[in-house]
């Protein structure tokens, strides 16, 4: 069993404060929740297990036991997970407050050790100091944390996480903040705690302490669509879909890193708990992570042969053509915005190809096809620009005064004409590479303007931000019939 979980189970009994704070799902009545194949550490009980998604942020960081309480590290209620979560600039004083909280909730002194030793020895054959019987006394105080960056804000969730080498499929990475504190001072705190333990347990305590306090921090991970609930991902192709989340809230102070100090004043802590309540939010899916997911799915179904075809219909409306017909049964095409982008991009590219190459039918095999598969995913800017550059080179542009030009004299639809006028101020006869980049980005930005999107969804906002946005009715997306430009 996880050390942190064991420790909470036993220390929960020592006083009223601990009974309120150390309440974990894994040590209460089990309520089943959907299991997934995502492996990682539950932020609530610190055990490595199969995770389910959090109802507060939709990321995978809860185990099936702890999910019954719906706690999130972004809550504004002073539960243990929130008090262990620090944000952005963490000072030495903040870490000192964290250590004080650990020492308050998980004290090790002669009275506590005797209490646990006596209760354990009441059972037969338990006169030896075997690790598994005293796991709750072997949790050292460390500055080990799991950290994640969410649109410029870095969150550190402190705890005692066993088996650091296990598979981690979450966006959280191990970070050691001992260098921001004082190694010798932390050593002294733990040696004092260790001195109350029987000699047989001291070595195990020391090994655990040094293994969790001297490790090298991992490189921070990038948050992707894989880290969010499958229920959300499955509904992304519905333009009117909103994510429903719940947050545990209370009247907390604005000092994010100072919440852990509440345990030093028991009456103040319980007064704050009296204001606890749940808030519900309906959140837009509009963000770069989810937009890229949709564009990547659409990219898998691209039929590049359309750019050399003579079809009179738009790219998504071609039927009974072996080379150009897309399968409209895929859910990605349920989002009319993706269809609109696909139609306009391919209408523009076909005009470019027809203006510069002598290709008469979509059955022909052209080199340009291999680069067209990446024209939708504008979120991967470097890869996208390489693809557009290669497409431009395939047009065999003419060079004048060190600038290459491609002809543009083939008909396009009215949507593309309007975007041409908006982006390059006219309906041109010739285009440079830069013009083509601007036009193609304008076609995509009309519906998904990633320049003004946050990277992760608003489900990763703090409660304060959600409240401010909710006041202005900005937590929901634009009306499904209006583009980003409008």
Curated annotation (Swiss-Prot):
Region Important for cytoskeleton localization, residue ranges: 82-176
A Gene Ontology biological process term: symbiont-mediated suppression of host NF-kappaB cascade
Modification note: The C-terminal region is phosphorylated by host CKII/CSNK2A1. Phosphorylation of the DSGXS motif is essential for host NF-kappa-B inhibition.
Main location: host cell
Short motif (pLxIS motif): ranges: 480-483
Residue ranges annotated as motif IKBKB-like degron (ILD) motif: 479-483
Region (Interaction with host IRF3): 317-486
Entry function: Plays a role in the inhibition of host innate immunity by inducing the degradation of key host factors required to activate interferon production such as IRF3, IRF5 or IRF7. Associates with components of cullin RING ligases (CRLs) including CUL1 or CUL3, which are essential multisubunit ubiquitination complexes, to modulate their activities. Recognizes the host NF-kappa-B regulator BTRC through the presence of a DSGXS motif in the C-terminal substrate recognition domain.
UniProt free text on domains: The integrity of the zinc-binding domain in NSP1 is important for degradation of host IRF3.
Listed name of the protein: Non-structural protein 1
Organism: Rotavirus A (strain RVA/Human/Venezuela/M37/1982/G1P2A[6]) (RV-A)
